[in-house]
Amino acid sequence: MARAKRERPSLMDAEGTMAVMQIPGHDHQKPREVTLEEIRAVLGDCQLCPLGQTRTNLVFGVGNPHARVMFIGEGPGRNEDLQGEPFVGAAGQKLNSLLGLAGLRREDIYIANVIKCRPPSNRNPQPDEITACSPFLREQIRSIWPDVIVCLGNFATQFVLRTEMGVTKLRGQLYQTGHFTVMPTFHPAATIYHSDWLPLLENDMRMLGQWLADHPVQE
């Protein structure tokens, strides 16, 4: 007997506004009056995991310290490792081209990664590496205190939403976890090799833009 097809949650609620799925976790998070510069100073020449021995540069993060939208990726690639800044390679160029779909510019957002040092040969981050690095990402989030966190790819999605599910099952929907509205979507680099994912990523960026339009900053 064929399994009944599971209905995907509607993106609109009964009042016609964008629906957001509630996810437990982060409920007790509060913003911290600590600057990104202070967090970076604590990191210093971090050697908390073996990646500190193989990196060229620690890639902390870059962007607007008061951003409404924070993008979180997986980890630095070769270009990021060389330049010390996230999303400067092909994935960064792809991301820049997509931001306009959400009504955003690069200077509007903040970008960081789950880990801050490039894994050798761009392999996936190891659990101990994520464990060592994650407290600093949490402090960045609490310092910026964005309205929306955009998770690019599986590792960011699983870290923020505390799930083992992959982004392909979770994208296309907004999630609320504590203060934060979270949007999982594909990593821009993945669309370079999976061109059929690009329209889905574009749709997600439009969804982000709609949410921002529906939730303007209160003066």
Where are these regions (language model features)?
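A polyanion-binding, active-site-adjacent surface
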Residues: 2-219
